[in-house]
Swiss-Prot record:
Family under the similarity heading: Belongs to the glutaminase family.
Protein name: Glutaminase
Pfam family, one: Glutaminase
EC id: 3.5.1.2
Catalytic activity: L-glutamine + H2O = L-glutamate + NH4(+)
Statement: the UniProt record of this protein carries the keyword Transit peptide: no
Record-linked PANTHER family: GLUTAMINASE
InterPro entries reported for this sequence: Beta-lactam/transpept-like, Glutaminase
Enzyme category, top tier: hydrolase
Chain sites annotated for binding substrate: 61, 111, 155, 162, 186, 238, 256
Encoding gene per record: glsA
Signal peptide (from-to): none
GO biological process, one term: glutamine catabolic process
Record organism: Pseudomonas fluorescens (strain ATCC BAA-477 / NRRL B-23932 / Pf-5)
C-alpha cells in the first residue's frame, strides 16, 4: 500500500497547475497550490500516508458529514421531515430549486440542507461550534484539531447567499433559530483544520458499521451508517457525484478546501488533499488520485 500511494502521487503531481484554488473565500485563496497529500486508514487501525498527509487544511463541506451524523445521533429519522436525501442536480448554493420546493432542501450536503442540519443542531446544543469541534476531536483522535478563525470570519463576511437561503427557508417555516447565530456555527464547522490522516481516521466508523474502533464508540447504527454512505454516494461531490461514482465508485465527500474523503465499506477510509479545484468545485488532482487508487485495488462498490 505504501509503495502504491507514493507511486500514485508521483503520477498525478504533473496535473498541479490545471485547476484553481477557491478564490471566493479570500482566506483560502492564499493556500499554496502545489501541496498534495493522501492517507488511508484501515479498519485494523493501520495508517498509510504519502505527501502532505499531515498538513492541516480547511475541511469546508466535508464538515457537513459530521453535522449530519450529530443530528442523526440525537434526532434520528425525525430530521428527514425537514429535508430530503435525493441528488439536487443543481449547484450546491442554488436558490432556484429551494424556492420551487418550498424551502425543503433536497439533501444535507448542499448548502441549504447543511444549514437546516445546523439549525437542528443549534436547537440541541448550547454551544454548537464547541460541540462540533469536540466531536471531531474524538473521531479523529487528535485533540489539536482547531477552527481557523480567519477562515470562519472571512466566510461570514461573504455570507449573503447562505443567509438568503436561510431566510428563504425561514419564510417557509423550515428554519427555527436565529439565522445569524446558525451561520456563525456553520462557518465555524467549515473552518475546521484537519489533515488527511485526521480525516481518514475521523471517517473510519463509516467503513465499520458505525463503530469507531479507536474511541470505542458506536457512533451510528449499521443501518444509519448505510444511509449516510448512500447519501455520500449520490450527493457528496456537489453536482459531480455521478462522475465520481463513474471514476472512483465509492461514497465520498468533498470540500472547496481541496479535500476529498472516500469510504470503502468494511475495509478502509481514504482522504486526499490538493487545493486546486476543477469547474465543479472538487479537487482536480484529488479526483485523479482516488480514481487510480480505486482502479488499481479494485475498490469500486459497483
Amino acid at each position: 500500500m505504501q509503495d502504491l500511494l507514493n507511486q500514485i502521487l508521483d503520477e498525478v503531481r504533473p496535473l498541479i497547475g490545471q485547476g484553481q484554488v477557491a478564490n471566493y473565500i479570500p482566506a483560502l485563496a492564499d493556500v499554496p497550490a502545489n501541496q498534495l497529500g493522501i492517507a488511508v486508514y484501515g479498519n485494523d487501525g493501520q495508517v498509510f500516508s504519502a505527501g502532505d498527509a499531515d498538513t492541516p487544511f480547511s475541511v469546508q463541506s466535508i464538515s457537513k458529514v459530521f453535522s449530519l451524523v450529530q443530528a442523526i445521533g440525537h434526532s434520528g429519522e425525525a430530521i428527514w421531515e425537514r429535508l430530503g436525501h435525493e441528488p439536487s442536480g443543481q449547484p450546491f448554493n442554488s436558490l432556484v430549486q429551494l424556492e420551487f420546493e418550498r424551502g425543503r432542501p433536497r439533501n444535507p450536503f448542499i448548502n441549504a440542507g447543511a444549514l437546516v442540519i445546523c439549525d437542528i443542531n443549534q436547537s440541541r446544543f448550547a454551544a454548537p461550534a464547541l460541540s462540533m469541534r469536540d466531536f471531531v476531536r474524538r473521531l479523529s483522535g487528535n485533540l489539536q484539531v482547531m477552527v481557523d478563525g480567519r477562515v470562519a470570519e472571512s466566510e461570514y463576511q461573504h455570507r449573503a447567499r447562505n443567509a438568503a437561503m436561510a431566510y428563504l427557508m425561514q419564510s417557509f417555516g423550515n428554519f427555527h433559530n436565529d439565522v445569524e447565530a446558525v451561520l456563525r456555527s456553520y462557518f465555524s464547522h467549515c473552518a475546521l483544520r484537519m489533515s488527511c490522516v485526521d480525516l481518514a481516521r475521523a471517517f473510519c466508523f463509516l467503513a465499520n458499521d458505525g463503530f469507531c474502533k479507536h474511541s470505542g464508540e458506536q457512533i451510528l447504527t449499521r443501518r444509519q451508517t448505510q444511509q449516510v454512505n448512500s447519501i455520500m454516494a449520490t450527493s457528496g461531490l456537489y453536482d459531480e457525484a455521478g462522475n465520481f461514482a463513474y471514476r472512483v465508485g465509492l461514497p465520498g465527500k468533498s470540500g472547496v478546501g481541496g479535500g476529498i474523503v472516500a469510504v470503502v465499506p468494511g475495509q478502509f477510509t481514504v482522504c486526499v488533499w490538493s487545493p486546486e479545484l476543477n469547474s465543479a468545485g472538487n479537487s482536480l488532482v484529488g479526483m485523479a488520485a482516488l480514481e487510480l487508487l480505486s482502479q488499481r485495488i479494485g475498490w469500486s462498490v459497483f
